[in-house]
Amino acid sequence: MTVDDNSLPADLAKEIETYRKLFWVPTETLHKVIEYFIEELERGNADGTDPTGIPMNPAWVLEYPNGSETGDYLAIDLGGTNLRVVLVHLLGDHKFTTEQTKYHIPSHMRTTKNRDELFEFIAQCLEDFLRSKHPDGIPSDAVFPLGFTFSYPATQNSIFEGILQRWTKGFDIPNVEGHDVVPLLMEQVEKRGLPIKIGALINDTSGTLVASRYTDELTEMGCIFGTGVNGAYYDRVKNIPKLQGKLYDDIDPESPMLINCEYGSFDNAHKVLPRTKFDIRIDDESPRPGQQAFEKMTSGYYLGELLRLIMLDTYKKGLIFKSYTESSEQIKYLETPYFLDTSFLSIAEADDTPSLSVVSNEFSNKLFIDTTFEERLYVRKLSQFIGTRAARLSICGISAVCKKMNHKKCHIAADGSVFLKYPYFPERAAQGLSDVFGWDGIDMKDHPIQIKQAEDGSGVGAAVIAALSHARREKGLSLGLKK
């Protein structure tokens, strides 16, 4: 047999047809989701406090970069396992160079009881980095504006602050939630006498948009398709009712305002997304049921779990893995939540060997299950259905923003592990956009709206935003709510 052979046993063929229909998102459903998505974007700009809606957080970036920005800027990106420190040289003419170092965050530090320990560590890394770049001593007249990429839920009343709402990514440090993280860091920076001043605190999605706009002025939106999903775009101040009466007079109603949507929470009210019983189970058994509804159907974190649940369901019907009893170690693995990650689907989709031998090895190595060719073909097809649904739903956020802002021709800057590593994701997303906007017969490379690989959002994006805020501050203009 070959991977192109569609012959499955009658019972599995019937099962696969059921899942093909269940996971296919027709164009009319996409239109329905997009229409409601636009309503949610508008509602978030009007209020943003509805727990079933999209927060639509103003990011306090009030200009577009035009590629002429110059200067040397520091950027830090606090991830779950590493701290990345980047020196960004903005050269103008849409060009830049970077120098960077990654510092491993000791695991105990993510749950330390002393909040100063984390910020001491970050400041020490900044000092080590600067000294490595200036072995003869840091110039006495140097001042490095710092772009701080802080990709944790935070409230911002200005570009220079970020009040942590809740820790994620394995961090759980007391006395930081509810506090502004910028002074906590700058206290440690100042103790070391480092010539650093805060230039901006940003989210990685905002940075993705701005970094890409710096090099490509057709960029209108930044998106993350990874373990989480998110989008950022520029709206107009006049379109954000929740800010009216709260801004200084120097901010023009026509001014652009970068919005960090945090639209993983789209449709938390479960009105339009085509959820299956498996999606409902994932939500019900998650730490936060009823939250991040869109993320749970599109992000890399959940795709492996979807496949696991369907395989387990098929096994319990007696259709696959027939030689293994429910008490066997192999089935215990299959019953373990989140035992499979998205790489399992990626490998299944990418395997073009005649007997699907790569998939066979994955089953042997991860689940210790010996599979038949038909079982492997079944799982490969399931992976295709799950991956295609995620890609088609993912473009609903892009389509909603483009329709709302009347962007007829633009680029969407995309980053994240699913976009970069999942087979056929970009092509399926492009096909979804084509179906929504009616581009039949137009080659993908000629589509009016194109998804492009983003520039480094958490490094270069943070630096460009720091440059924009520095220029605005030099003019004496405001960058936040009225005090």
Mark where each language-model region is.
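ATP-binding/phosphotransfer module of carbohydrate and carboxylate kinases, centering on a glycine-rich
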Residues: 1-100, 104, 108-144, 190, ...
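Short glycine-aspartate micro-motif
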Residues: 71-77, 143-147, 200-202, 220-224, ...
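Conserved beta-ketoacyl condensing-enzyme motif
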Residues: 146-156
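Glycine-rich phosphate-binding loop of actin/hexokinase-like ATP-binding domains
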Residues: 95-100, 169-178, 209-308, 312-314, ...
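Intrinsically disordered, low-complexity regions enriched in proline, serine, glycine
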Residues: 86-87, 96-97, 157-159, 198, ...
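Hydrophobic transmembrane alpha-helix bundles
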Residues: 171-187, 229-246, 365, 438-459, ...
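A short acidic Gly-Thr/Ser loop motif
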Residues: 76-84, 151, 205-206, 224-228, ...
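Glycine-rich phosphate-binding loop and adjoining helix at the ATP-binding site
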Residues: 103-123, 154-213, 220-221, 237-265, ...
